[in-house]
């Protein structure tokens, strides 16, 4: 493991990068975190703010095909509790590139229509969601 001020890099036994994590002055994850498969293919990119997942996260299959993309949002309630949840569109794909599922989140709860597809492209489910119901 290399540590250079605010960046920590870990390696697989074969010498390929395993992860690269940036830290703020308080020692908490800050900014982009990247993880790789042992083969060297990128596995995940996620953004952090003060140690909490915040913003875009993208995952890939080892083949390089996009697997999942979503956003996290952090907020604080009236008594100072901090919450991080999915917020916005979340999309998943089959390794072939065909869309697998798509739904929208609002502060961690599915809202609107959630869709799932078979790998052939045929719709599997279309489920409406409404917050509070």
Residue ranges with predicted function:
Residues 1-133:
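Glycine/tyrosine- and acidic-biased, solvent-exposed loop/turn segments at the edges of beta-strands
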């Amino acid at each position: 493991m290399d540590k250079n001020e605010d960046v920590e890099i870990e390696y697989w036994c074969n010498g390929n990068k395993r992860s690269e994590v940036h830290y703020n002055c308080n020692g908490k994850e800050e900014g982009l975190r990247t993880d790789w498969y042992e083969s060297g293919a990128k596995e995940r990119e996620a953004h952090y703010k003060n140690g909490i997942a915040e913003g875009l996260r993208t995952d890939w299959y080892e083949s390089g095909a996009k697997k999942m993309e979503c956003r996290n949002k952090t907020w604080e309630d009236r008594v100072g509790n901090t919450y991080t949840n999915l917020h916005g569109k979340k999309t998943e794909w089959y390794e072939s590139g065909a869309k697998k599922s798509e739904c929208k989140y609002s502060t961690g709860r599915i809202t609107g229509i959630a869709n799932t597809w078979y790998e052939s492209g045929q719709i599997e489910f279309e489920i409406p969601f409404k917050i509070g119901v």
